[in-house]
Amino acid sequence: MRITGTEWEKGGINENEAIIFAQELERIGCHYVCVSSGGNTPNPKIPIKPHYQVHLAKTIKENTNMIVRAVGMISDPKKANDIIISQEADMVAMARAFLSNPRWVWDAAKILNHDIKVPPQYARRL
């Protein structure tokens, strides 16, 4: 389920309320949340920058036992890997990264020094 970690504005959902909501979701059987933010109040002051929502996922992960996915301008393979390794989140979502670079997975594998096996039909494009 996708939840809001904060609305970035007074009167909207804040981080403490997001924790309570996530804990209630877990209590009734939810096993996974994707933590986003903003978009439900009229004038949020969203600090848009790379990884700006990762701390929200980390907060939910620290306060539940659910699988948590982080979002928020995650495009750098090393940072995406660091988010997982540091247990800030269990998964990362990178929609815009894939839209701007359909070869993101291959490029990330090279950057992170992962040897991946590919069918011969695709190898010529790497």
Labelled PLM ranges:
Residues 1-126:
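Flavin-dependent oxidoreductase catalytic cores
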